[in-house]
Amino acid sequence: MSKLILDKLKVLRPLIKSKGLPCEKYGVVKDGILYFGNGFIQAEIPIEIPFNCCIDLYQLETVLRNVKGESVIINKDNKVFVHFDETDYNIETLPIDSLNHTINFFNAQTSVKCDESPCIFKWLCGIAEGYVQPIGNEQNVDFLCETLIIHNGTLVCTDKYNIIQGILDFNMPTMALPLSAIIFFNKIKKEDIVGMGLVNEFLLIEFVNGLKFYMPNLAHNQIERIITTYNRLVGTLDRVWEAPNIEIPVLVKEQINLINKISLQNAVFFNNTFCRAENSEIHYPSFTNEPFIFKCLYRNLKVALFWGKYFKTNEKGMSFLSESSLIRGYIGKVLDD
């Protein structure tokens, strides 16, 4: 039993803190389902604990991981113990209703099953963590730069200077996802997704390991506003984006990544024959006869180099396109050198 429980706790480990508020480290077991909610996201997974309780998940996982051998979890005198050999390890608990303000006990079913895991949704969530800004005012969310927007079969986000858009490989409704939820999703997204659905104001994502993950959908009751913001973003991208036609060789990408490592400067100058950052300079064979020159922040360039296959620059920015043509983006604020 202990190994089965430990396997489930390992799934939630990236979400759980060792210290902090009770909602950040405790979970509630009800009828064989473990529920966790920290005020930003919610998660639930079947677990082999045969009684209901509100339990310190970090403490439980730590004890089970360090006990050498098979153990059992018992409820004795309204306390929870991990019993091993002749030793009982007491695990801290709270009253069963202590987390009712941060947990909705949905145990919902996904309305749409995924024959294949939606990879582009995962990829773009990873990219969006560097684009989407934290919400400054909960009462007046700036959907333009404080959410990842999904609409019309695509996903788009911006940091006001750079824009990236992806064509989804799975049909999803109109949504706006905040940075806080994206960060937690990126911590646990390694497993394949097998189902999705909308549950009240949440996007439900079900993974192959049995985990159900709920991300707050800020588009709930805000659909028209989200669509207007989406159209504004995509319209801006259409206006500044130029069809890329220059392929940057892997060797050149490697040199740009290298010069960032040996330089303390955030900005990288880059053209078709060399790259420069601070006092460091690396030369490579010319890869195009077309004008190709710019300077920008490396953190923005890094995303383009990783996902982009084809590129085009002008006096204001750089457009890039993935090999599959499913992801495109634009880096603004390119500086002359």
Regions found by a protein language model. Name each.
Residues 1-337:
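Structural preference for solvent-exposed beta-strand-turn elements
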